Amino acid sequence: MEEKRMYHVKIKNEVKEYEAAITYHDIAKEYQKDYEHEIVLVFVDGKLQELHKRLKKDCEISFVTTADPIGHEAYKRSMSFLLVKAVYDVAGHKNIDKVRMHFAIGPGYYCTITGETRVDDDFLERVESRMHELVEADLSIKKRTVHTDEAIGLFGQYGMYDKEELFRYRRVSKVNLYSINEFEDYYYGYMLYSTGYLKYFKLYRYDEGFVLQMPEIDKPETVPHFEARTKFFQVMKESVKWGDIQEIETVGGLNRNITSGDVQETVLVQEAMQERRIAEIAQMIASRPEIRFVLIAGPSSSGKTTFSHRLSVQLRANGMRPHPIAVDNYFKEREETPKDEKGNYNFEGLCAVDIDLFEKQMQELLDGKEVIIPNFDFVKGHKEFVGSPLKLGEHDILVIEGIHCLNPKLTKALADENKFKIYISALTQLNIDEHNRIPSTDGRLIRRLVRDARTRGASATKTISMWPSVRRGEEKNIFPYQEYADVMF
């Protein structure tokens, strides 16, 4: 009898032997008891792998759970697949034209269905029930690789024309497809092992569609109640509408636009729309002479500084004299900056801002006094008081930007009638296809990499290592206050 081949696998601080071709899923089951949250992916010698993959060599393995960013995204991606499968099961293929995952609202996704299907409470109850049935059945989420031309033909047959168009512009020769039973779809990223992992979700009817509510990363077994974010939702819905009007609903549509030679006009239209909206905001501010402080808030690298300068131009066109001020210049001295639980400087919390100095100078300006605004040197880690003093005249207005500008604690000493609050973010309404979103955080991380390298003396490695802390800070310090804004952009 032929002896089975064995491989040595290092996990944590121990080395164990496993038979060749054992799945990572079987290895993960052995270690699940040591983890608070479910293991959903593995790193094999530093390379991310799905659990259905098999052991092929001596290696070192580390586990990824639903409480890790990569695992959390894989959970949401797989949950999207489960939802789409359930919708088609309940409604029937002939009654559906499109199932669209539009954008995130908190920890959930706003979705719509077009076709002969009416999205009401009864329909959502049946879809949710079907999703639970699929979870109970613990069906494998299978993966296969096909030639791109074959994928184009398949999705044409399935009526998923967004994917058919997407793959027409794909340069690689092969595509990975996933299936639950015989239902097949494409997802951009790794998936979970089976439907049995997808226990935590809730559907809420909202506006013209519904929200697929899922756990947050810090509580991966708890589904929070859906909280409507009306202003944010309307801004995103309007952006989706404009994309549809221009027939650029997905990346495939954008690629079509580029190859047809229409992209320059598309860019000009987008710029014109943005400038028109900025002009409208400036007119709103100019119509209220009591406003002396324009407060612009948004997450990291969302375009606050650029927006503040563009708004300033429009304010000048309305006869005002704007003075842009960055809250970042009011950071505490480096030696006074608080640290997080890991001993790293916490630049994202309001505690990193010298609120006393900020309040003092803003009140002095409101009282007609001269003030020298500080300039923070991020390399040296301290404020410098240089430049000409500032004094507000009748037509002067301060345009203040920073991640905490909507937090009432920052401007509690200033009267509400003197403030106009704006929330801005580089939101992504364009998706890869109807079932694969492009998270707005991805674009902001790229922007931050460039900014930190150019102006803050930080390497790409340092910026990426700090990003999880930045994201936690946004969830705590920024997003809870976005509905306080007078307008969103």
Region locations from a protein language model:
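Conserved NTP phosphate-binding and transfer environment spanning the P-loop NTPase/kinase superfamily
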Residues: P289, T411-F489
